[in-house]
Amino acid sequence: MKPFLSRSKTESDDKDEYNPIEDLVQTVKTIMEHFFTPEQYKELFGTASEGLHRSLTKYKNRKDGAQFLKAVEDFNQIMRKQKSLGAIQEHVRQYGHRLPYDLVVHLLQQVYSRTVAARASKLNQYEAFSNNVYGEILPILTKEFIQRTKMDESKVFVDLGCGIGNVVLQVALQTGAESYGVEIMDTPAKFAKKQAREFEARTRAFGLNHGAVSMIHGDFLDTPGLAGILARADVVLVNNYAFNSALNQSLLQLFLDLKEGCKIISLKTFVSLDHKINVRNAGSVESILRVKKYPYYTNAVSWTHNGGEYFIATVDRSAVQAFWERAMSDGGASLDDGGSRRSSTRRR
């Protein structure tokens, strides 16, 4: 690991500008915390108040380049020895596909800073109030999606309208799931592919496992091969916060062939929370979806600091089947009054 000195910064510089020195310090901290046991950390690097990371931070703050470089070389020597002993590889191997969240976020931030950050302003070039408005779901909310849907390495995940692919990469790395992203807009789609390439190289350098990643540039309503992928999907994400009703209705038709138990995460619901099955709507896609609403809190999405809500709809055809079985058992008498039956589950 070799630092390079950034240009001198003034007080007016953008605070969000990539800082390689800060990145190096945070990378060292991440490696110490997640590639070694607590006992190894203390033995090899010292304590948090007096150890090597403290030295790096101190010399960075003092702008003492010579001592900073010496601390980096001390770290590199330790790493070379531990790598030769196989200690690092052994510890990382124990994670399998259950990587710590902080490690995942740091690696994704490194990928972003090397592929997107310098050109991020291009992402704002879209038609306002259209279906192609750009916005990203942030890692903390993606983490919640993963927990709610119980994603793991046996699952298939599809992000319809994936933007620059951040969620796809996080799911692949944090869970090991086979992960797909589809994006229609040229600029985000190009960034998604660049991120995927950098992600592959960086995870390989760190020795980390991840699920297969595929970024597709195309319209999710008309992408060859997507129907086959969706038929295998266990979790589908649709950031439909800015979609109009026509596009949401078109999306519903894609969901008709999803397998039983597939979960659809969306920022706007595709079906009313009090949807009732009756003779008129029993054949609709809405009637096979069992939906629940969840809150999200501050700093969970890129387009607002405020909280909001999201929905998880589960494909469940049992309510429709029960409706028709009931109708057949009484010769259709129960349909005379509309024969409605509430399809969503109530929280207890």
How would you name each of these model-derived features?
Residues A172-L173, K193:
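Gly/Ala-rich phosphate-binding loop of Rossmann-like dinucleotide-binding domains
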Residues M1-S154:
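S-adenosyl-L-methionine
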Residues P188-R348:
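Domain-level detector for long C-terminal conserved domains
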Residues G165-L169:
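Glycine-rich SAM-binding Motif I of class I
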Residues E178-E183:
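Conserved SAM-binding motif I beta-strand of class I
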Residues E153-G163:
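Conserved class I S-adenosyl-L-methionine
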Residues G161, V171-A172:
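Hydrophobic alpha-helical segments that mediate membrane insertion or helix-helix packing
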